[in-house]
């Protein structure tokens, strides 16, 4: 997970940041029913803090557009932020917190038992995850 900030924001120069250092900033977040918003609210509750929300949007592209327009900063998956940073003036600052490293798994009973299109999907997801871990993207 990263903190997305406008490219010219003072925090854009940081190598990383703790989530606790961002909660008092104006935030752009996904809608309340989203998993990421619920998780951030849970983290804030554990810290006895409230996330300072400026606006809630429906997707990461909209969040990045709001960040680019200096409406606020946004916590989001690194892959989403970097994808939009290619076309928008935003910077991605990695979060230092342990919880910010997400491990995603693909679970199937039998990979060999899947239809070819499903195996292709699993292969694509695994390749994308490996590329993201190396800081690359796949087409």
Question: Residue spans of the language-model regions?
Answer:
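Flexible hinge/capping segments at coil-to-helix
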Residues: 1-27
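Generic preference for hydrophobic
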Residues: 3-4, 27, 75, 92, ...
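Short secondary-structure boundary segments
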Residues: 7, 78-80, 104
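Short secondary-structure boundary/capping segments
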Residues: 11, 18-20, 45, 82, ...
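A late-sequence structural motif
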Residues: 12, 91-134
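Conserved sugar-transfer catalytic core signal across GT-A, GT-B, and GT-C glycosyltransferases
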Residues: 17-18, 62, 102
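Hydrophobic hinge/microswitch elements
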Residues: 29-91
